[in-house]
A protein has these predicted regions:
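Short, flexible loop segments at the rims of nucleotide/cofactor-binding pockets, characterized by
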Residues: 11-14, 39, 68-69
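Metal-dependent phosphoesterase signature
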Residues: 1-25, 30
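Asp-based, Mg2+/Mn2+-dependent phosphohydrolase catalytic module
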Residues: 25, 29, 41-42, 46-147
Length: 147
């Protein structure tokens, strides 16, 4: 079964890109609540986040089996946010990410690299960035534009 084979060596074709850990740490030290909203089954996303050492940065890891509908529906995002948020955004790399953010009424930032078959600048995101280290600047620009 695919899931068993993939789970057996979950990090074989996965990598943590430059700047991810430092940026997540920066966001956390400033009080940001962070969630992973993925269409990857939770058993796999939990294992991948643990194996890469990233799980501790996130308040929630939400796979499709932990929500009412998978992306591009907004359920992942709305459930991860709960309520009472003043500023929120989605950082992703694909068309379903951008569509999910739009459906939730949130701005989106997409990476110019990742799993999208389409060029990042054609996905309709509010910002396209080329390094994860650019997330804080992109967020600041979004908040200024919405003020």
């Amino acid at each position: 079964d695919f899931i068993e084979i993939y789970a057996a060596d979950i990090c074989a074709d996965s990598q943590v890109f430059d700047g991810v850990e430092a940026t997540l740490d920066w966001l956390r030290t400033r009080g940001s609540r962070l969630s992973v909203c993925t269409n990857k089954p939770s058993v796999l996303s939990d294992a991948l986040m643990a194996e890469t050492g990233l799980a501790g940065y996130f308040d929630r890891i939400i796979g499709p089996d932990r929500t009412t509908a998978k992306k591009p529906a907004p359920d992942h995002l709305l459930e991860s946010l709960g309520g009472g948020y003043a500023r929120a955004a989605l950082v992703g790399d694909s068309e379903p990410d951008v569509a999910s953010a739009a459906a939730a009424g949130l701005p989106s930032i997409v990476m110019s690299y990742g799993y999208s078959e389409r060029p990042a600048d054609s996905l309709g995101a509010d910002r396209v960035i080329h390094s994860f280290s650019d997330v804080p600047l992109a967020l600041a620009e979004l908040w200024r534009a919405r003020a």
